[in-house]
Amino acid sequence: IGMTFSTKTKKWDAEITTEEKWEKQMSDLTSVFIPAKEILSNAWNLDAAVKMGNVEFDDTYLDIIAAAKIDISRGVDSAARKKYLKILQQISSGKVTLHEDRFYLKPGTQAKLEFNLVAEGLRKIALLWQLIKNGTLEKGSVLFWDEPEANINPKYIPVLAELLIMLEKEGVQIFVSTHDYFLSKYIEIKRKSDSNVQYISLYKDEMSKVQCEIAKEFELLEHNTIMDTFRQLYREEIGVVL
């Protein structure tokens, strides 16, 4: 698919080529975008407010709320789904519930908590739990996640990386945008030798045009501001010690 637009292009007016072929191939595809900012705590009556024009929100926020509201499938979880949920329980044992358009987190036998009373990092993990539990994320689906590491306790980054690797292995295509060294390296460490994980770096050349670089290993990226900053910190730390 090809798309052409400029700063003057109005919404939905971009020039698109080969759209029909693309739509036919992707007609049965389930995809979800998780923004860097957690939104479920603000879900109450948001759809109605947007439709009435009282507030303006990016459509991606409305999409993720709609995906999270999908009823949790009845019956026994599949073996793959059980594996995912077991990993997430290392971070949070709570389960997501929806009541009167409000999201709650119910930790074990404790009383349910409104989402806005829960730490933002745990809200993001709870959202992931919900998307796995209700079948939004399963084999053949696509996940776009902007800065998964944001507001996550650093000690849980390895758990998050392990879950992403498992989802990828089971057939979920994942696109992650990150500025975090630890998440990038843990994904590299935990992946298998036959993994299809690739690292992509977007940068501007001398003409200020956006270029793309792809590598199988994180440190093989020539345009890698994450590694550059990490090395700079290491040199400065050594300088302080010496």
What does each model-found stretch correspond to?
Residues 1-140, 205-242:
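Phosphate-coordinating catalytic segments in nucleotide- and nucleic-acid-processing enzymes
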Residues 123-126, 158, 162:
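Short, contiguous clusters of charged residues that form electrostatic/catalytic patches at enzyme active sites
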Residues 142-144:
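Walker B motif beta-strand of ABC-family P-loop ATPases
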Residues 146-148:
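Walker B catalytic acidic pair
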Residues 153-154:
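Conserved D-loop-proximal element of ABC-family nucleotide-binding domains
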Residues 159-242:
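C-terminal lobe/lid and adjacent interdomain/linker elements of RecA-like ASCE P-loop ATPase modules
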